[in-house]
A protein has these predicted regions:
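Conserved alpha/beta-domain cores
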Residues: 1-189, 194-196, 202-204, 219
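Short, basic/aromatic-enriched C-terminal tail that caps enzymatic domains
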Residues: 202-222
Length: 222
């Protein structure tokens, strides 16, 4: 018997504790990152009333959530992985949030399919703060122009910024930079913080925590 629900409650209690101790203004939502996990591992969370879940691959998300989501309109599904333009239509159809908007071509496709499907997606611009070649994301010095393009030319619903700090880095430093960038654009939401650094992310004002391992356990990736 897995203890995903107990783990979620434990994390929720820890989040409450941090919010109260640090007198934070923001209480972040917990996105349970379910990529690679079977639905049997997730069902107890869904039955408990948890609604925010994250996936990083379109096909897996369709197979796992397509039918379930059609029956439960409260589910809020988050695309947290790299999104290719040829998968944009499926992403717009299935997801409620996309955390990985990182180029003009993708922005155009999302705009196109929003109109076709008569649906507005909540979008985060992904930032590549450390200019890591293996990671996607807009450079910080390109952010303002890209944001204005998405807003004024495409009327996209940009709600915030997302980042993935470099492994073994001072996450707090990167989170603080993202917070300042969001403040400059008057963006309220921040998608930052995973199982290993969510406490630091909270101190910088994260509004969405992307948590997988700490709730569902280690992934079996072959």
């Amino acid at each position: 018997m897995h203890n995903s629900l107990d783990n979620l409650k434990r994390v929720q209690n820890k989040v409450n504790e941090i919010v109260n101790e640090k007198q934070l203004k923001t209480y972040p939502k917990i996105i349970v990152v379910t990529k690679t996990f079977p639905f049997s591992k997730i069902s107890s969370l869904l039955n408990s009333g948890h609604t925010h879940f994250g996936e990083n691959k379109i096909q897996e998300a369709e197979d796992k959530w397509g039918e379930v989501k059609s029956k439960n309109k409260n589910i809020q599904l988050h695309m947290i992985g790299k999104l290719q333009t040829n998968k944009a239509k499926k992403a717009v159809a299935l997801f409620d949030f996309i955390h990985s908007l990182d180029n003009q071509k993708l922005a155009l496709k999302i705009c196109q399919y929003e109109k076709e499907l008569n649906k507005k997606i909540k979008l985060f611009i992904q930032i590549n703060l450390a200019d890591e070649s293996q990671k996607s994301g807009i450079k910080l010095n390109e952010l303002n122009d890209f944001y204005q393009y998405c807003l004024k030319e495409l009327s996209l619903n940009i709600i915030g910024l997302m980042c993935l700090p470099p492994i073994n880095s001072n996450s707090q430093e990167y989170f603080s930079k993202i917070k300042k960038a969001a403040d400059r654009l008057n963006l309220r939401d921040l998608s930052m913080g995973m199982s290993s650094d969510y406490e630091a992310a909270m101190l910088s004002g994260s509004t969405y925590l992307r948590l997988g391992t700490i709730i569902l356990g280690e992934r079996n990736i072959t």
